[in-house]
Amino acid sequence: MNSFMVMIMLTLTLSSIMALLAFWLPIMKPDSEKLSPYECGFDPQGSARLPFSLRFFLVAILFLLFDLEIALLLPSPWATNISNPEFTLLWASLFVLLLTLGLIYEWLQGGLDWAE
């Protein structure tokens, strides 16, 4: 066995042992101090569980998807230096088309409307 395989096996074994120990050994004793939110030493003013807008979450996820699209398409001008640049153009166009169809679907389903 080469040293790389030994290192991989050792890493997997140690991480598995530590994960199992962390799962089996914790002693959980909940009390009022642990269950209350921490507010810089002051008594809590209200509930720590605030309502969350699912529409905002959807728009944030869509922003992340389209931000990822830009990050994936930025290197495409350098990819045209390969032997077949038409292949790169085809994949980039299919990628943009797929994301555009997803955006149109979200728009038609009303996922981007703020008012109901």
Swiss-Prot record:
Enzyme class: translocase
GO-annotated molecular function: NADH dehydrogenase (ubiquinone) activity
DNA repair listed as a keyword: no
Membrane topology: Multi-pass membrane protein
Compartments, as annotated in UniProt: Mitochondrion membrane
Catalyzed reaction equations: a ubiquinone + NADH + 5 H(+)(in) = a ubiquinol + NAD(+) + 4 H(+)(out)
Disulphide bridges: none
Enzyme Commission code: 7.1.1.2
Transmembrane feature ranges: 4-24, 56-76, 87-107
Family statement drawn from the similarity comment of this UniProt entry: Belongs to the complex I subunit 3 family.
Function: Core subunit of the mitochondrial membrane respiratory chain NADH dehydrogenase (Complex I) that is believed to belong to the minimal assembly required for catalysis. Complex I functions in the transfer of electrons from NADH to the respiratory chain. The immediate electron acceptor for the enzyme is believed to be ubiquinone.
Protein name per Swiss-Prot or TrEMBL: NADH-ubiquinone oxidoreductase chain 3
Origin species: Petromyzon marinus
Chain's gene name: MT-ND3
